[in-house]
């Protein structure tokens, strides 16, 4: 029964559902749900509308007070106050100088307009708030200007800035060394260098590290806000500072509107590179410097940017439709670009493969090196320092020091005896003091190097030593008293296998060649003064005049030869740019006259001059070839000057007296002037020796003459002022004793590392007052890392600079520097700086738009251009003093230092901190900055490391 009943229920239920769906359709369920939702939603809407209406009625009732209305006096007063415009008088005087106040007022106006007014006027039309802000800014500027007038800025600009820059460079140099030492196999990234930089900074500064401010934008903004608030506290009246709203507005304008954009611009590497190029815009980039930069570049991005630009220029040149003379120019340009592209590709492949080639090691393994004679080494500062290092390693330093000491003794003795003979000619009273001092100096040299007590002792023949001792005891000393022994010592150093022969097989010799720029790849040469192949006798190489052999007529006195440089030009041959001189030659005899032109480079003149001065020694004192020039050697004015000098050289050479005095000279002259390609008789090495070493040799030989002439110039002036030559001789005699009684000692390392302190902590007291000497010593030490070099070289450089400055200018440079600082801080220059700031941020009175980021390729090419400019302006004289390789490394180090935004920010903040410490010396700004930087992570690590190293020592106690 139950089963039948359940079946009946299911049956009727199914039938009902089917009928329901047939009647209302299959979507009736969705409609039903929709109807229910609409019903519920409608009820809620009605409820909300009812509540809203009742709420509005209640609020309207609450707005009206139930108290009786007051009189109309208060509303009337409020209306009167609104109608009265409160006038605020603002004194527009800021610094007391109208030329400064006017642009400053414009800066204030533009700042308020672009940072405050554009949003303030949407809130209120009341001008009083804006006037209060303006008054607050003016009060701060007035206090700032007043304080600036009371400060002596000379120590800051001549001492503090130089110390800060030198210290920054030292930290960067040590960071570079530390990154290199960490792992030679894996090249450190820029992030590693920045992190290591701040590690070194905290080790050097001890109590401050600026890593957070320089690497975290959030912390940097907080630092600037705190700094601006401190400045406002010092500059604003107490009433204005207590107004938080006003103070915060001014703080934000200064921090985010002025200081932060300025710091961003000054620390941008691309901006610095463009500024460097602009600063030396007058110097022309030469081919050799450009190719050296590509060869030395380790940045693939730079090489790719140059390669892509070369490919773009190639495509453009190949698309040109040219004919005639232009086709040769286009072909030369295409060849040059192809060569640059090839060098870039080769360098990129080498960097990507990781197979970096050490030029010094490669040259050492190759075995075929230039031979530098010993006499050239002894007169060249750069070469001598390497030979000195080697002699110290082999125990032969006594021989070298003896040779150097005797050279110095000879020059000084000649000078002293010249003074003495001058007194005899003038009939003045004689004194034996000078001879006594010379005898004492000679005896001192004998005791130091040659006596049995000498240690180490110079080993020479005993009879020479005995002869010298007898001369010292019985005769007056002469400048040549040590010549025989010095000659023997020279031969010993030259022939003994321990010394010069072994030095040529040592790695120091290869490094010496690198510093002398004698390991250079010849494929990268080419300039006006280059040593490449001589240019053909004619520009096209196809013009050949049918001339008889000029040398066949040398014996004919009736033949007259005249030549002059008629024109100059700049040529480009396979990427090498050089100057070409067109020489017009006239040959006359009894019956005929012939004329032709030949073309020569400066290197041809140089080679020709070397050949004839070697063959005819008397010409070396008569003929003077115009010297080389490092940069601007393609400048039109320079080429005209050189043309004039070379013309004078030719006219002197072709004088009849000169030709008759040296009949064989005519053969060389005719060969040089003949219309054919000049065959150089000297090799590349010989010309380098003539350029780099021989002038120094000649200068060493002429030191005696230069010193002899001293009493007629500088010393004579001193004598006229003091009228006491005896005192001057006594002082010079004391210098002899101090110079020659002892072997030049090496500077020993102290227990405290001098590298872990600021650069100013290592200067001598007598250097501190000499501003130019101080600046040059700091820059030479830190840029070129002279502390790692031979200390004899460093002392020589210091003495050279010191004597040059003091003897030539005295206090003149100091006065000029002080006057220049006064000029920089004068109202005119301050006004000019404010105007430049105004024009940079608001050109034509309109806020400057954000400069779009320059393309990476453009920035990379700017880097190449900047380095090329720096290389091009480096004088050869600097390379002669400290070495070519050291000069290149120093330039690249300084340039690389400015390629890191974080490190540039650090330098800007260091300069800012020094400026504020100078401006407010009575306040403890140093402690304030230490506190603001106290959250540095590197500082915390350093303190933990310091505590961990000090803990064991404390436990032992």
UniProtKB/Swiss-Prot annotation:
Domain of life: Eukaryota
Membrane-spanning intervals of the chain: none
Keyword Membrane carried by entry: yes
Residue ranges annotated for the PX domain, each copy included: 559-680
Membrane topology: Peripheral membrane protein
Boundaries of every RGS domain copy: 373-511
Gene Ontology CC: early endosome membrane
Residues that, per the record, bind a 1,2-diacyl-sn-glycero-3-phospho-(1D-myo-inositol-3-phosphate): 601, 603, 628, 642
CDD domains for the chain: PX_SNX13, RGS_SNX13
Domain-level remarks: The PX domain mediates interaction with membranes enriched in phosphatidylinositol 3-phosphate.
Family: Belongs to the sorting nexin family.
The name this protein goes by in its record: Sorting nexin-13
Source species of the chain: Mus musculus (Mouse)
Upper classification of the organism: Eukaryota, Metazoa, Chordata, Craniata, Vertebrata
